[in-house]
Structures are given as C-alpha cells and as structure tokens.
Amino acid sequence: MTRLLIVGPPGAGKGTQAKRIAADRGIPDVSTGDIFRQNIKDRTELGQQVQALVDAGNYVPDELTNRLVTVRLQEEDAQAGFLLDGYPRTLAQVAYLEELLQGWGQELDAVIQLVADEDEVVARLTRRAAEQGRADDGEDEIRHRQEVYVRETSPLIDVYREHGLLVEVDGLGEVDEVAERIRTALAARGVRPSSDAGRA
C-alpha cells in the first residue's frame, strides 16, 4: 500500500508526474480539482454545494473539501493507496488528513516536493503562454502565481519536513528524467512501485 502526496510550483510539471507516479504504482491520482468536477457533474449533494460556492465566486471551505476527499479515499480504487495532488492546501487540512489516516490505521509514506528554479519556471511558462497566444499570461502574472504558491505551501512543507516525510526532487528536465529521479528518491525511502501495478 502506497500513500503519497505531491506538491510543486506552477510550471514544474506536477500534473504530468502525478499521473506517471500513480500509473507506476497502480494507485489513483486524487486531485481536488477532479473531485470537485466529478461531484458537480454527478450532481451529488456535496457537488451541488461546491457548484453554489463556485457560482458565487467563493472558495470551497476546508470542511467541505475535507468531506469530499474523505469520500474519495473510501472508494475501492484507493484501498491499495493513493497519490494526493492539490490537497492538503492549508494547515487545517494537513491536521485533518493526518487524523483521518490515523483513524484508519494508516499514514503517509512520503511527500514529494518538486523543486525548480523560479526564473527557469517563469521562462518556461512565459514561452508556453506566447506559443499558445495567451497574451494575458505575462511574466508579472506568472511570477505572482509563483509567489502565491510559496506563501501557501511553505508552512505545509515545513510540517512535512519536521515529520520526516519530505522528499525533494528537481522538477526541471525531461519528463522521463524527472520521473526516474522521483522513483529513485522514493526507493531510497523504501517506497517502491507495486509489483502488480497496472495489472488490475
């Protein structure tokens, strides 16, 4: 059973690597964005609450996000483990997740932090925006998103570092190269791919 969490700044390829790690280990890539969209699409009770908040231009509060994640982690495909992407985002969510897993007799195996030089990431995203014709995605906006990421995730990263769970990996480079770095870093912690990954 493998229980992982991945964090990384915009432009560091977190979404791509999350899918690779999940496929490698035969576990679901659990993204809060996907959970919100699926619940809205399925018109679940919680999904309708999310839709109302989004329509009003409000953030989804911790309590509702926590409930949605709890329901998702109880689904059959997450029983052999999971990779969380985009959750937790606040210290309250960190505490909730720890308590939730403890209640199930579980704990996180590792927190993968993709690290990347800010100037390189900004250059990469600026090029991508120009190629895709997104003139509104200028360097100032991109740098602002990097600053928000650092401000929001630094306290979470500090907690996971104190818990001895943090695995730092250079997120820049070819997709396969970064994936191999992650695999090596996790193996060094004793977190290896499931031998039956992908057979289900």
UniProtKB/Swiss-Prot annotation:
Catalyzes the reversible transfer of the terminal phosphate group between ATP and AMP. Plays an important role in cellular energy homeostasis and in adenine nucleotide metabolism. The gene is adk. GO terms for molecular function: adenylate kinase activity; ATP binding. The keyword Ribonucleoprotein does not apply. Its EC number is 2.7.4.3. Monomer. It comes from Clavibacter sepedonicus. PROSITE patterns: ADENYLATE_KINASE (PS00113). One of its GO terms (biological process) is AMP salvage. This is Adenylate kinase. Gene3D superfamilies: P-loop containing nucleotide triphosphate hydrolases (3.40.50.300). InterPro entries: Adenylat/UMP-CMP_kin, Adenylat_kinase_CS, P-loop_NTPase. It is an enzyme of class 2 (transferase).
